[in-house]
Design a protein with these regions (language model features):
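Divalent metal-cofactor coordination and adjacent catalytic microenvironments
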Residues: 1-208
Length: 208
């Protein structure tokens, strides 16, 4: 699933609701996916091409980064100098975190080196090039997305506009989402909250 895609489909929501897709289900699951991202502070899709992002170390040995799903293509540059991949220890090991498999890497620990770090002034930016995201969207995240989508669908607000195009009246309908508290949709839904809370993280020091 590419970055920016919904974690479930409109047809998945149709099955959950046991009703046909009314034409807005794809928009609803997209909004629900963004709600889950805001609540967890994570992006569960993945990129297939490595891209550079910048981060700051939190101490001499640990660099929290955005989630990345493979060490293939991993490059670390400090002050313009490339480090060897063996200079860092990506964690969690074996994709296991809190006893659960399937996790990406999100911490880089140094091996016989230290990150540029100071408690005085601004810390140096460290450039990490990686394939960001998760190998696969976790099932609890898919279900949390459907929980939120179900709530959105129940309280849906639709704008209807009509305009003349070449002498023909054309009516358009659009889903109104700008007034929604997206992150609040997760915390306000007990099922979604319980499914998503294990994936909440502190924000890394990244600059996309």
């Amino acid at each position: 699933v590419a970055i920016g895609d919904a974690y479930v489909t409109g047809e998945d929501l149709a099955v959950r609701l046991n009703k046909p897709n009314d034409g807005f289900f794809d928009d609803i699951v997209s909004a629900a996916s963004r709600a889950v991202e805001l609540f967890t502070g994570r992006q569960f899709n993945r990129t297939e091409t490595a891209a550079a992002r910048r981060f700051r170390a939190v101490d001499w040995y640990r660099l929290p980064v955005d989630d990345f799903w493979t060490t293939t293509g991993l490059v670390i540059s400090v002050d313009g100098t490339a480090w060897l991949v063996t200079d860092v220890d990506p964690r969690p090991w074996d994709g296991i975190y809190n006893g659960q498999p399937g996790w990406p890497f999100f911490d880089l620990f140094t091996v016989d080196r230290v990150w540029p770090y100071t408690t005085r002034g601004r810390r140096a930016l460290i450039t990490v090039t990686a394939k960001w995201g998760w190998t696969a969207v976790p099932e609890p995240i898919k279900q949390a997305t459907l929980d939120v989508a179900q709530d959105i669908q129940a309280g849906i607000s639709v704008d209807v506009t009509t305009e003349q195009v070449g002498g023909v009246a054309v009516t358009a309908r659009s889903l109104r989402t700008e007034s929604m508290d997206l992150a609040g949709l997760v915390s306000g839904n007990p099922a979604a909250f319980l499914r998503a809370i294990p994936y909440v993280r502190d924000s890394p020091m990244g600059i996309a």
